[in-house]
């Protein structure tokens, strides 16, 4: 079973998240940020990851802490569910269009968290979320999951750009964590990720 449940409580947020990497794409998402709920539901569906997120945060201030901490918790849960990486494909990429927008994502689920993000959002991005916060979410996720990600987005509509990015990341992740029976071991010459 490649599952994980993580709880994180700080003075700013309280988050409980569970996931199943080998799920069907079922999502139960409650973050208090409707647009972000939509993005996480898309992530679950297109990654075929069963994902449950219950989050409360200091949204009266702004959505920064909530979105950042969900990235931390999701990354932690992904790292736990992948475990030592035995048998995973490890590398994958995906390109997802959404009308005029296009997102390209290449991943290495190799234990080293790093993000390269190319593309722009409006200062007040999709769903009223500050545009730079979308990139920050992926940075938090990758850092805590031990995933290197290169994300490139183009387009004019912030909603389309963001949704394409979440879907492309999910599809690449699904392929990268897929078990390849031919591998059978940790996919690294070092013997560990």
UniProtKB/Swiss-Prot annotation:
List the taxonomic lineage: Archaea, Methanobacteriati, Methanobacteriota, Stenosarchaea group, Methanomicrobia
- Keyword Hydrolase listed: no
Predominant localisation class: cytoplasm
**Listed EC numbers:** 4.2.1.19
Query: Which pathway does this chain act in?
Result: Amino-acid biosynthesis; L-histidine biosynthesis; L-histidine from 5-phospho-alpha-D-ribose 1-diphosphate: step 6/9
User: What reaction does this catalyse?
Assistant: D-erythro-1-(imidazol-4-yl)glycerol 3-phosphate = 3-(imidazol-4-yl)-2-oxopropyl phosphate + H2O
Q: Which Gene3D superfamilies match?
A: Imidazole glycerol phosphate dehydratase, domain 1
Can you list the GO cellular component terms from the UniProt entry? cytoplasm
**Which locations, inside or outside the cell, does it occupy?**
Cytoplasm
Provide the species name: Methanoculleus marisnigri (strain ATCC 35101 / DSM 1498 / JR1)
Protein family: Belongs to the imidazoleglycerol-phosphate dehydratase family.
User: Which residues belong to the signal peptide in this entry?
Assistant: none
Q: Can you name this protein?
A: Imidazoleglycerol-phosphate dehydratase
Q: Which cysteine pairs are covalently linked by disulfides here?
A: none
Q: For this UniProt entry, which segments traverse the membrane?
A: none
Instruction: Report whether Cytoplasm shows up as a keyword of the record.
Output: yes
One GO MF term, please?
imidazoleglycerol-phosphate dehydratase activity
Which GO biological process entries does UniProt record here? L-histidine biosynthetic process
Q: Which UniProt keywords apply?
A: Amino-acid biosynthesis, Cytoplasm, Histidine biosynthesis, Lyase
């Amino acid at each position: 079973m490649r599952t994980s449940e993580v709880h994180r409580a700080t003075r700013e947020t309280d988050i409980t998240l569970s996931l199943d990497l080998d799920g069907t794409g079922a999502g139960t998402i409650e973050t208090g940020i409707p647009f972000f709920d939509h993005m996480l539901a898309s992530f679950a569906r297109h990654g075929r990851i069963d994902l449950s997120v219950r989050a409360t945060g200091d949204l009266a201030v702004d959505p920064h802490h909530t979105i950042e901490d969900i990235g931390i918790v999701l990354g932690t849960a992904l790292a736990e569910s992948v475990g030592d990486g035995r048998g995973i494909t490890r590398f994958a990429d995906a390109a997802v269009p959404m009308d005029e927008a296009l997102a390209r994502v290449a991943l290495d689920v190799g234990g080293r968290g790093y993000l390269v993000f190319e593309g722009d959002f409006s200062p007040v991005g999709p769903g009223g979320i500050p545009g730079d916060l979308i990139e920050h979410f992926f940075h938090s996720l990758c850092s805590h999951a031990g995933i290197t990600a290169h994300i490139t987005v183009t387009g004019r509509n912030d909603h389309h750009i963001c949704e394409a990015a979440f879907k492309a990341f999910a599809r690449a992740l699904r392929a990268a964590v897929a078990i390849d029976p031919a591998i059978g071991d940790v996919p690294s010459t070092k013997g560990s990720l």
